[in-house]
């Protein structure tokens, strides 16, 4: 991965990411490097350009730790993991969930609190459901959010390497 401070890169929490194909397409269109980080081997299509695979140890948070450590201004982090989103934002990265939700410094506190509340309710047996199934509208929202994040970074002076 290019680690020049003024370049754009995409870091993906890939183990359960449903939008990897979309990330590859957008990255190719913008000529951006992508780093797929996972706890196990994940296949990368041959046609995917500038994609690096990082397989971390089986430790539960190893992928999150790697992504948080490599997050920086100019990085776009794709994750559904709220604590990881918070850590990446602290490092100055842009963060997008696979459903297209854009996390920011001003929204992550409430999102993290809601996540912790739901975890507590689930632990107490009060809530048994989970998030809604991933839908085509989520894929579309993600594509829009990723394009928007890249455009904002370019306007802020970051560039493709």
Curated annotation (Swiss-Prot):
Reading the lineage from the top rank, the first entry is Bacteria
Q: Supply the InterPro entries for this chain.
A: UPF0178
**CDD domains to which the protein is assigned, alphabetical:** PIN_YqxD-like (cd18720)
Q: Which Pfam families match?
A: DUF188
Q: Which residues cross the membrane?
A: none
> What protein family is recorded?
Belongs to the UPF0178 family.
Q: What is this protein called?
A: UPF0178 protein BSUIS_A1819
Q: Which organism is it from?
A: Brucella suis (strain ATCC 23445 / NCTC 10510)
